[in-house]
């Protein structure tokens, strides 16, 4: 959801609470539980999962490896669930032409730098940069070049925008901020 007027433009950024992250977290959790149960059932010699008889899987080496994969999968899925619950990467970009200020806010991981807040003047913005990398895995990212701070990304690196969409976004931002567009 975005909100735009003549003087203020607020763009909300979705963080890690995306459908794909929910799907990956569920798949990893269920798969790792399955691996762990198969490894434990091979150790106990009893069927905890009816799909695999425990006599077919030896504890050494298959059962140990299955337990290891199950535990590793649980760690990775718990990491994904934590990033989803903390909504890491979400926030907003606020461009205020009236005040001449740009504010970029993002939620990070818990700790000292949980809230990432950048604030700078519009007159410090040199240009909107469009980095395009074509090939097998194309990547198109928009950056805002700021005097003294370098490039700040405006679009996510995992957003798969078409060339037309990225050009339109760059043109809208450049028009609103009254800065040139650079392509790299």
Curated annotation (Swiss-Prot):
GO biological process entries: photosynthesis
Superkingdom: Eukaryota
First-listed, main subcellular location of the protein, grouped into a coarse class: plastid
Any one GO CC term of the record: chloroplast thylakoid membrane
Cellular compartment(s): Plastid, Chloroplast thylakoid membrane
Membrane topology: Multi-pass membrane protein
Residue ranges of the TM segments: 22-42, 57-77
Keyword Transmembrane recorded: yes
InterPro entries linked: PSI_Ycf4_assembly
Keyword terms of this UniProt record: Chloroplast, Membrane, Photosynthesis, Plastid, Thylakoid, Transmembrane, Transmembrane helix
Purpose: Seems to be required for the assembly of the photosystem I complex.
PANTHER family with a match to the protein in the record: PHOTOSYSTEM I ASSEMBLY PROTEIN YCF4, PTHR33288
Stated family: Belongs to the Ycf4 family.
Designated name of the protein: Photosystem I assembly protein Ycf4
The organism of origin for this protein: Illicium oligandrum
Classification lineage: Eukaryota, Viridiplantae, Streptophyta, Embryophyta, Tracheophyta
């Amino acid at each position: 959801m975005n909100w735009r007027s003549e003087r203020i433009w607020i763009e909300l950024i979705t963080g890690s609470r995306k459908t794909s992250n929910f799907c990956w977290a569920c798949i990893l959790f269920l798969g790792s539980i399955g691996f762990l149960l198969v490894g434990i059932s091979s150790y106990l010699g009893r069927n905890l999962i009816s799909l695999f008889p425990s006599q077919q899987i030896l504890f050494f080496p298959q059962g140990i490896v299955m337990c290891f994969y199950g535990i590793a999968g649980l760690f990775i899925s718990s990491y994904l669930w934590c990033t989803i619950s903390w909504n890491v990467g979400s926030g907003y970009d606020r461009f205020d032409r009236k005040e001449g200020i740009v504010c970029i806010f993002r939620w990070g991981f818990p700790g000292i730098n949980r809230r990432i807040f950048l604030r700078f003047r519009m007159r410090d913005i040199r240009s909107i940069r469009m980095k395009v990398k074509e090939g097998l895995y194309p990547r198109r990212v928009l950056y805002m070049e700021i005097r003294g701070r370098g490039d700040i990304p405006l679009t996510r690196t995992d957003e798969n925008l078409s060339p037309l969409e990225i050009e339109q976004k760059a043109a809208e931002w450049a028009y609103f901020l009254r800065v040139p567009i650079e392509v790299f």
